[in-house]
């Protein structure tokens, strides 16, 4: 003991020495301060002396008073500093004296100090520090592990992004190559366009020159006809010029013979029945090039026209000789000779048409009425549509048809130009269609319908065209009927060339409406312009051939329009004369256009496929938009209370206790009955009685059922057995009139274990139902009790299927065994019994199911655009893990226009509110609900509501209620 005391004394003496040394250091410091103050006073005195010397040396005495005031201020400051320093020194001396006294007292009382208490306190302090450090280390290790995981994920994402960038770069290279190819093709197409434009300008210049020549020839022909009429007049009077009569007779006979021979040869050549059938059979196997057929037709027509030209030259020579002999030109003409010539030509035309009608298609031939009812000039139009189609397919063009019946062409020409310039009304169209039906009498009923459909008129837009001009632009008229998808996008010919031929294949009819009353009424008929001129050709090169034939027909129209006489010989001569002039022009154009058609045909096929694909995509989009189910759910139709995979409109308000009287009243109000109302999702309550949220016991039952998610606790069979008894006291349930059921052997049932999950059938739908079950009663009970028991009901909520019944005992939940089972089922390890109390869980779920009004922000993935916010009423369906919301509370407020929306909950994160979301009236933290679609950002009014929602969502997702973070 003495040694210990000696050691303590030595230690105490060492402490005193240290304190003395510290006091000495302080004294030395004070002395140093005194010396510094003395040095400063000396410096100030020297400055004062210097200033005095300067004053003596100064010549200006204006600043004397200023210097004096400065000196006074300096002296005052020095005096104040001296006072402060002296006070400091006195205080330090007093402190040193006090410390000396304390040291002496401590030294005297050192024997009484207990050193053990000091060491214990030091050890406790050290242990506490060590524990805190260990906790900090653990927390840091957890953070490091989390950061390492994040680093690994980021590395994987970076590698994936690098691969995607490589793919994008390769795709860009390929696209650039394709772009260069497309540009090259576009340049080639532009070059071709320029070449075609040049060719078209040349063609137009040639057509102008040809038209001028034709006009000259028409004037010559009129002069020749005047001479012929003069010769006929002289012959009837019986003059003495025999040579002139012989020449006239020879000319007439030659013209008639030529016309008859030409008609017979053409009809025999092109409309032989045996040759026509053979050619038609060959065409089914081997298609014929339309260019070759048209060239052959032109060559034959030119060879025939050469013979006629010789006869024209002879007639001219004879007419010149006759003009010298004729003296009187003013005498009246004789109608006998001219009428005989016209009747002969008409008879020949009738024969050729009848032979053509029988040779081409005897089945589809049309019965001709009496010639007295209609004019002879309309015979040419009695051909059916199928006959003309077969004639044109057998390589017989419009040139040969015009030679066969020239009278009809004159009427076609004049009606064609009148239809372009006139305005057709709907009444005229109806009247003309009726006339067509009266005139035509086909042999078969099937053919009758086709002819009537083809003869119908269609009101179309008219285009101003000059009838006197030789040109007739068809581009403007065809573009009105073409679709945008059928036009050439990359390769356009000039506006005069037709863009496509599909319309000509659709709208083809060669049957104009007929009208009784002679030539004048016929010329007033208004026929659509395209139904008179459109030929039927093969799909290969339609747009080119149509244009060529149209240009040639224009030339015929201009020649024949100015002619008033309808003589067969004159018409054939003029047409064949024009064909000979146009032969060189056509042969030069054919060789150039063949190559262009081959190039454009491929482009047209590609553009057609593109147009069809665009149409298909638009149809798919319309179907998809109509198939999407985003219907608005009305009030009292909460479909998400049932299984989320099958959308059913149900209302969990039906799970409340309902008496029989309310059900009967509701049946009277509802026309379909209470069960139909339940299936439709409507409330069973009468509309007059508002809903009151006072059934807290039933809400507790629903909240307790959320703890055992998708589990059947008791079935109907178990309720019927002896294991189930009744709560006879009925003390806590007199208000609702419901009976409580208690299990005798609660621990024996395997239904409470976490491993038993019932499997519902795939085809059956699962949704909550309200099942009313009558309770049992003993024979010993009174009549009143029996009546009360009979009216009482138990509403059971099925979680898995409709056959399952759920009734949870309340008394057993408060026991300790049930809390342990709850903890095991929810996987809440590491928590105290107070945290997993059933009452607290029930309150949380009850509050969340009833819902709160919270602030909702826009549903975006980032926190950048949070400008708009709105209040919504939110609640949770714990059975399906669904978050529901609406504009107002759908359970209290009236109105059926309130829409309910819902989303399945996947997770939750809590984030501090950024500057954009801060509000003084709301809580600072934000709940971000992770859903299947987009995150939902919510903000509660207070911290209490915020914590309740957070804990309830964690419980629903089978997570810990409280965060177990290590304390620091």
Swiss-Prot record:
GO cellular component assignments: cell cortex; cytoplasmic side of mitochondrial outer membrane; cytoplasmic side of plasma membrane; cytoplasmic side of plasma membrane, cell tip; plasma membrane of cell tip
GO BP term, pick one: chromosome segregation
Sorted UniProt keywords: Chromosome partition, Coiled coil, Cytoplasm, Meiosis
Domain PH: 847-958
Disulfide bridge map: none
Signal sequence region: none
Chain coiled-coil ranges: 68-91, 152-240
Molecular function via GO: cardiolipin binding; cytoskeletal protein-membrane anchor activity; mitochondrion-plasma membrane adaptor activity; phosphatidic acid binding; phosphatidylinositol-4,5-bisphosphate binding
Subcellular location as annotated: Cytoplasm, Cell cortex
Main location (coarse class): cytoplasm
Entry annotated with the keyword Coiled coil: yes
Job of this protein: Involved in chromosome segregation. Facilitates nuclear oscillation during meiotic prophase I, the 'horsetail' phase, by acting as a dynein anchor. Essential for anchoring dhc1 to the cortex. Required for proper sliding of the microtubules along the cell cortex, which leads to the proper U-turn movement of the nucleus.
Name the record gives this protein: Meiotic coiled-coil protein 5
Protein source organism: Schizosaccharomyces pombe (strain 972 / ATCC 24843) (Fission yeast)
């Amino acid at each position: 003991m003495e040694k210990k005391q000696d050691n303590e004394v030595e230690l105490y003496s060492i402490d005193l020495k240290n304190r003395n040394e510290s006091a000495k250091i302080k004294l030395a410091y004070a002395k140093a301060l005194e010396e510094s103050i003395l040095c400063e006073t000396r410096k100030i005195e020297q400055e004062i002396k210097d200033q005095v010397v300067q004053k003596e040396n100064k010549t200006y005495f204006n600043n004397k008073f200023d210097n004096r005031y400065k000196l006074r201020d300096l002296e005052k400051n020095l005096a104040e500093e001296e006072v402060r320093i002296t006070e400091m020194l006195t205080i330090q001396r007093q402190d040193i004296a006090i410390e000396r006294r304390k040291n002496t007292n401590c030294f005297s009382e050192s024997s009484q100090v207990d050193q053990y208490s000091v060491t214990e306190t030091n050890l406790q302090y050290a242990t506490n520090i060590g524990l805190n450090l260990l906790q900090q280390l653990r927390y840091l290790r957890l953070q490091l592990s989390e950061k390492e995981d994040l680093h690994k994920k980021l590395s994987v994402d970076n590698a994936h992004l690098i691969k995607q960038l490589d793919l994008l770069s390769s795709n860009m290279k390929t696209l650039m190559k394709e772009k260069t190819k497309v540009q090259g093709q576009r340049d080639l197409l532009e070059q071709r366009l320029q070449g075609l434009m040049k060719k078209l300008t040349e063609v137009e210049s040639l057509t102008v020159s040809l038209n001028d020549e034709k006009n000259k020839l028409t004037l010559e022909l009129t002069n020749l006809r005047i001479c012929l009429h003069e010769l006929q007049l002289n012959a009837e009077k019986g003059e003495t010029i025999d040579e002139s009569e012989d020449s006239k007779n020879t000319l007439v006979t030659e013209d008639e013979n030529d016309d008859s021979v030409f008609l017979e040869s053409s009809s025999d050549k092109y409309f032989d029945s045996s040759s026509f059938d053979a050619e038609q059979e060959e065409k089914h196997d081997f298609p014929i090039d339309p260019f070759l057929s048209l060239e052959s037709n032109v060559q034959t027509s030119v060879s025939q026209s050469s013979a006629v030209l010789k006869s024209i030259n002879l007639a001219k020579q004879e007419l010149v000789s006759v003009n010298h002999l004729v003296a009187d030109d003013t005498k009246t003409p004789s109608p006998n000779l001219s009428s005989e010539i016209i009747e002969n030509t008409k008879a020949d035309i009738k024969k050729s048409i009848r032979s053509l009608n029988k040779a081409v298609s005897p089945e589809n031939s049309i019965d001709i009425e009496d010639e007295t009812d209609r004019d002879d000039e309309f015979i040419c139009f009695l051909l059916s549509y199928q006959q003309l189609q077969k004639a044109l397919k057998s390589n017989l063009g419009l040139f040969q048809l015009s030679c066969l019946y020239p009278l009809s062409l004159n009427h076609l020409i004049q009606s064609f130009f009148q239809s372009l310039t006139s305005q057709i009304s709907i009444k005229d169209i109806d009247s003309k269609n009726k006339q067509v039906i009266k005139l035509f009498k086909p042999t078969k009923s099937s053919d009758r319908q086709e002819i009537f459909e083809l003869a119908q008129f269609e009101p179309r837009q008219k285009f101003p065209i000059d009838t006197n001009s030789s040109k007739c632009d068809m581009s403007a008229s065809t573009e009105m009927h073409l679709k945008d998808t059928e036009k050439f996008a990359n390769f356009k010919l000039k506006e005069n060339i037709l863009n496509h031929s599909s319309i000509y294949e659709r709208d083809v009819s060669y049957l104009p409406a007929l009208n009784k009353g002679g030539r004048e009424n016929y010329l007033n008929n208004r026929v659509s312009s395209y139904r008179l001129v459109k030929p039927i050709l093969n799909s290969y090169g339609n747009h080119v051939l149509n244009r060529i034939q149209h240009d040639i027909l224009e030339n015929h129209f201009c020649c024949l329009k100015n002619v008033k006489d309808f003589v067969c010989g004159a018409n054939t001569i003029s047409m064949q004369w024009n064909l000979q002039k146009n032969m060189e022009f056509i042969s030069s154009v054919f060789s150039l256009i063949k190559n262009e058609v081959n190039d454009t045909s491929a482009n047209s096929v590609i553009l057609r496929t593109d147009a069809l694909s665009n149409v298909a995509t638009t149809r798919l989009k319309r179907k998809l938009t109509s198939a999407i189910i985003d219907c608005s759910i009305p009030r009292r139709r909460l479909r998400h209370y049932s299984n989320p995979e099958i959308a059913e409109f149900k209302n969990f308000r039906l799970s409340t206790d309902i008496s029989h009287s309310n059900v009967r009243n509701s049946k009277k109000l509802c026309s379909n009955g209470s069960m139909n109302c339940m299936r439709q999702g409507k409330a069973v309550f009468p509309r007059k009685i508002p809903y009151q949220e006072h059934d807290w016991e039933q809400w507790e039952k629903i909240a307790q059922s959320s703890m055992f998610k998708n589990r059947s606790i008791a079935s109907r069979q178990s309720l019927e057995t002896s294991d189930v008894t009744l709560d006879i006291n009925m003390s806590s349930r007199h208000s609702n009139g419901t009976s409580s059921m208690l299990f005798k052997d609660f621990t024996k049932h395997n239904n409470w274990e976490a491993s038993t999950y019932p499997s519902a059938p795939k085809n059956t739908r699962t949704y909550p139902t309200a099942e009313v079950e009558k309770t049992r009663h003993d024979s010993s009970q009174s009549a009143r009790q029996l009546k009360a028991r009979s009216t009482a009901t138990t509403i059971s909520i099925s979680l898995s299927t409709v056959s399952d019944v759920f009734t949870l005992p309340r008394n057993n939940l408060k026991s300790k065994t049930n809390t342990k089972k709850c903890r095991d089922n929810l996987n809440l390890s590491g928590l105290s019994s107070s945290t997993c109390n059933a009452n607290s869980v029930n309150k949380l779920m009850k509050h969340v199911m009833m819902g709160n009004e919270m602030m909702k922000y826009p549903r975006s993935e980032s926190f950048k655009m949070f400008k708009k916010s709105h209040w919504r009423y939110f609640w949770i369906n714990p059975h399906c893990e669904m978050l529901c919301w609406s504009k107002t509370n759908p359970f209290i407020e009236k109105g059926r226009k309130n829409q309910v929306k819902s989303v399945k909950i996947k997770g939750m994160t809590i984030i501090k509110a950024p500057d954009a979301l801060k509000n003084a009236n709301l809580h600072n933290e934000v709940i971000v609900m992770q859903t299947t679609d987009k995150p939902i950002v919510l903000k509660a009014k207070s911290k209490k509501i915020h914590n309740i929602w957070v804990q309830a969502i964690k419980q629903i997702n089978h997570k810990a209620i409280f965060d177990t973070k290590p304390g620091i």
